[in-house]
Amino acid sequence: MSADIKKDSLTVAIVRLFTTSHLSLLFLLISLLAGAAALLLTPREEDPQIIVPVMDVFVQVPGASAGEVEQQVTTPLEVLLRQIQGVEYVYSVSRPGEAVVAVRYLVGENLESSLIKTRDKLQANQDMIPPSVSNWLVKPVEIDDVPIVLLSLSSSQPNGEATALRRIADELIARLREVDNVGKSWVVGSAPRRVSIYPDPAKLEAAALTLPDIQQALAQNNINLHVGTVTAANKQLVLEAGPSFDDARQVGATVLKSVGGRLLHLRDVAQIIDGAADVDEYTRIGFGPAVTAMQTVGNNAPLPMAGEERYMATIAIAKRRGSNAVSVAEQVLALTKQLKGTLIPDDVLLTVTRNYGATADHKVNELVMHLSLAILTIIVLLALSLGFKESLIVSLAVPMTFAVTLLCDYLFGYTINRVTLFALILSLGLLVDDPIVDVENIHRHYQMRKEPPLQALLTAVNEIRPPTILATFAVIMSFVPMFFITGMMGPYMAPMAFNVPIAMLLSLVIAFTVTPWASYRLLKGDYGKGHDTVFDLKASRGFKIYQALLA
């Protein structure tokens, strides 16, 4: 029988090869190293990414009422955009002088191809666009546009510092955009700086000046001309020449004309105000009792008092698609801390009002901790039921399976998120089944002592081969239908449908390679030890208990 098994069974040939060589040890080391690398390199997110391409079409119709915009532009545009392959919904808003049409594609559609299809459809039907339409614009909307970091700048200075906060925020965001994998970013709150000119009609009339004269004078005195470049030290410097304004004082010093040999400046006929632009929104930050627990960046000044309110400017930072939210957030905060005290004054308080990178990292680390506790629990239970050596053999399958599964996640573009780790926790109780059956049957054959240790191991593995393979693929097939879930739940549950079958398949491979190798190395010394008689199934305690229950 043994000779036939050795000659005919492919499984036995594989088991013999991995048991008698160093391939299993090599497989063990490579899988653990690859898993450690994948754990560090795979992007971390709080939830799986759901790709739902949405295109916003902005249409300008100057002078048209909301009803005219709806009849002439919005309704025909909705009909046209619904004809695009892959479009699921079309929404629209009509306002006086403008319309916004949102085109939502099916979940999983490619963002770039959806953008191209939308633009091509509009370009191919320009003859249907009413002459009253002055301009249209297509802008894609994606999940990565949601900011992962919000930095709020506030100051205890009086209200006049609101514009200064915006100026600091604009300079800071220009530096933060240099961080790798920083995507869309913008500033919210605090009106931007604007130099306003308020001409005095009486003085203009006395000087025989008009508003176009002022516009022409400003245009002539604010010119930047490109005159060439200079290359030195591997840098190319752009040379510009011409008069230009650096501050409000220079704007006021603009010469309008000469009257009686005396120069007439802009400040003589107009009021120049270096202040804020027209404000259509106000942003403030209030500090409550938990002010001492809030996260700040590089703050050395006393914290605000509970109940205090301040003007605020907020910097919103989003990440690029597929990048690691944790590393992007850490780099943004690190650079911000370096700039505190130089670009950012000491009296400006930087508060981290959102940090999805830290949130994702905390939740992933928390699940990893629970996963480690689950692995430890299984090892203890196996040690109590099978024995220490047997539990050690079975426990090898857990880190190896998870390591290679994480590597597959990295290679196939999946991220480490809550659903991914939940899939690993779910598969934990399933993936040890094959090694347990393997070790238990090898242990039984070593007790029977009918064959030499190596041959007994091969016979034991071959005996449980059909049910092990069948049971593993039965579990795999039960998770395959999750690949066909439609809608937003499809990509959300995709890590579950991917990770559990991969983990089960790897546990089967390990049961036929590493588990026999470890069993042969660790259990061979116990072959026949402590057993004076051949193992008798009917005399075992378990057999008698089951027999009594069935009777």
Tell what function each PLM region has.
Residues V380-S385, F402-V419, I469-Y520:
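Hydrophobic, glycine/alanine-rich multi-pass transmembrane helices and their short helix-loop junctions
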Residues R44, P48, G67, L386, ...:
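Short helix-terminus and kink motifs of transmembrane alpha helices
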Residues A316-R320, E440-K450, F483, Y520-L522:
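Helix-loop junctions at the membrane interface of multi-pass solute transporters
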Residues A37-L41, L376-R444, F484, I502:
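Hydrophobic transmembrane alpha-helices and their membrane-interface caps
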Residues T353, A360, V364, V439, ...:
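Helix-loop junctions and hydrophobic alpha-helical segments within the transmembrane domains
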Residues L23-L28, N365-T377, A397, T401, ...:
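Hydrophobic alpha-helical transmembrane segments of multipass membrane transporters and ion channels
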Residues M1-L26, M448-R449, L454, L458, ...:
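Interfacial helix-loop-helix hairpins and adjacent transmembrane helices
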Residues S2-I375, I416, P491:
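Membrane-proximal extracytoplasmic
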